[in-house]
Amino acid sequence: KYILAAVLGFAAAACNTDGCLDNQSSLPKAGLFSSATGNAITLSNIEISGVGAPGDSVLVAPGTAVSEVYLPMRSTKQSTAWRFRYDQEGLEGLDDIVTFDYESQPFFASEECGAMYNYRITRCTTTYNLIDSVVVADSLITNTDRLRIKIYFRTAQTPETPDTPDEQG
């Protein structure tokens, strides 16, 4: 009896697909931040698209509010570049290009999940029109849904009103 129960238990566990993570692609998640304050920001006047990517590579269209974006990499290449085009009066032609150099690493997750590619970012370069800097917080890109890249933008700041001392009479 006990052997039959154990065999049935193992068989049921082997057929279970709940162990597979929902996200089976390694996509680097990037967040947008203000270089002045360090706080997360939301932009709606930006288009983000792939440079030299086949077909329609627009990830974010102008008018779409975005504070985080997944920037897919290509397993057959060692570099991927993204264009940040600003759709705002006075900023025409001030596109920024962010380029990631990386190594593709095949990874076998499990029988249920199968295989995927992980990526190790080896270098990141950018132009500096409205992007102030790019920080790669974790160079290993896996299928874990975590913010790994922080893109800091130059943002306009409203001047703070200086405190005025109370007048004493």
Segments (PLM) and residue ranges:
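Bacterial Sec-dependent N-terminal signal peptides
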Residues: A12-S34
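Primarily extracytoplasmic ectodomains and periplasmic/lumenal surface modules that are beta-strand-rich
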Residues: S35-A40
